[in-house]
From Swiss-Prot:
Endoribonuclease; cleaves preferentially 3' to purine-pyrimidine dinucleotide motifs in single-stranded RNA. The cleavage product contains a free 3' -OH group. Has no activity with double-stranded RNA or DNA. Required for normal mitochondrial function and cell viability. Its EC number is 3.1.27.-. This is Endoribonuclease LACTB2. Belongs to the metallo-beta-lactamase superfamily. Glyoxalase II family. Keywords: Endonuclease, Hydrolase, Metal-binding, Mitochondrion, Nuclease, RNA-binding, Zinc. Zn(2+) 2 binds at D82, H83, D163, H198. InterPro entries: LACTB2-like_MBL-fold, LACTB2_WH, Metallo-B-lactamas, RibonucZ/Hydroxyglut_hydro, Sec-metab_biosynth-thioest, WH-like_DNA-bd_sf. Pfam families: BLACT_WH (PF17778), Lactamase_B (PF00753).
Amino acid sequence: MSLSVLPRLEQLSSRVVRVLGCNPGPMTLQGTNTYLVGTGSRRILIDTGEPAVPEYISCLKQALIEFNTSIQEIIVTHWHVDHVGGIADISRDIMKGCNFSINKLPRNPHQEEVIADHKYNYLKDGDIITTEGATLRVLYTPGHTDDHMALELLEENAIFSGDCILGEGTAVFEDLYDYMKSLEKLLEMKADKIYPGHGPVVLGARAKIQEYISHRHAREQQILQALQENRGKSFTSMDLVKIVYKDTPEYLHKAAEFNLTHHLQKLKKEGKISEEQSPTVRWRSNL
């Protein structure tokens, strides 16, 4: 998949500026999208990129100067290092001596989290965060992680989707059941636009969310079909990756296996397939 080229700094609307995390890679695409939100002299920063990326800190400083603004507070969409990792550098290089909060949803089950000598201010589903020109509503959307947050930007009928939905490709997840529920929740928002955690802005928001839901259902059917066509045989998860993800580049097979394993666990819970140890874990159809 060839990726769109994204500038390191871009004003996306009158109240949203994207600052690219300068950390491109197979899992981060063009890099983590971080966003300055609002229209005033103090704005909200959503996500912070990875640790020790001086190019990102330089881009963020440039954005603050260009738009004559400062950071009111930080919101991180989830605990992954490519979203929280820049907090220490921002605290030291941009916010030194400033009093500001770093907001996120708590881990589930709860665990104490400390980053860069800061304690998080924990939010809850439905909380409202405001700054001049922007109103954000917290949406608890677990699945990618247990603490995942999306944010509704009321003024634009838009969603900051974190890693629940990407601008290109599909997302990985920890819990497929929760992830599907979160996609349904976002679909019900009837948003017009998505500002994703990675990749370009999505303008056909509802179509994209429906595409994600349909994609996961289709993957499930492919797994069941592969097992049913070989009834009596058992397969390792990587065997199934090579069948189901045959059009996916091999360097992404480990990530694909991660997703496929969650499909297998869901299908096992539903009694459609069974797991056997011989000596590695293998799967067969019950249908």
